[in-house]
Amino acid sequence: MSSIETLVEEIGKLTLTEASELVKALEEKFGVSAAPAVVAGGMAAAPAGEAAAAEEKTEFDVVLKAAGAQKINVIKVVRAITGLGLKEAKEMVDGAPKTVKEAVSKDEAEKIAKELKDAGAEVELN
């Protein structure tokens, strides 16, 4: 009899409580879990949830799609947000669609978008 067969025979003689203690001891010693594997049907749902979490963006670009009817107000807001001069801000607004701010946090992007929308602009977050 090989050592593996002997070990299997000895484990087979353990009570349920002893077997449970053995599993816990092995989990601790080797840093593993004896949790059952997920069945095939459950695996399809799990990666979809993980993919959605992984795809959640942390940085956004604020894009000015159109200036709208109140172009002067939009130019003022673009100047305040970007720090551009009057001429550069006017060129940006006239050349819409243009990216006003790149790689900003979600909160900041929403704040900028609200300011631009309040001024009459059409805005998109990418």
From Swiss-Prot:
Gene Ontology cellular-component annotations: cytosolic large ribosomal subunit
GO MF term list: mRNA binding; structural constituent of ribosome
Mitochondrion as UniProt keyword: no
InterPro entries recorded: Ribosomal_bL12, Ribosomal_bL12_C, Ribosomal_bL12_C/ClpS-like, Ribosomal_bL12_oligo, Ribosomal_bL12_oligo_N_sf
One Pfam family matching this protein: Ribosomal_L12_N
Presence of keyword Nucleotide-binding: no
Keywords: Ribonucleoprotein, Ribosomal protein
GO term, biological process aspect, one: translation
Disulphide bridges: none
Domain of life: Bacteria
Subunit structure, interactors included: Homodimer. Part of the ribosomal stalk of the 50S ribosomal subunit. Forms a multimeric L10(L12)X complex, where L10 forms an elongated spine to which 2 to 4 L12 dimers bind in a sequential fashion. Binds GTP-bound translation factors.
Family: Belongs to the bacterial ribosomal protein bL12 family.
Described function: Forms part of the ribosomal stalk which helps the ribosome interact with GTP-bound translation factors. Is thus essential for accurate translation.
Official protein name in the record: Large ribosomal subunit protein bL12
Lineage of the species this protein comes from: Bacteria, Pseudomonadati, Chlorobiota, Chlorobiia, Chlorobiales
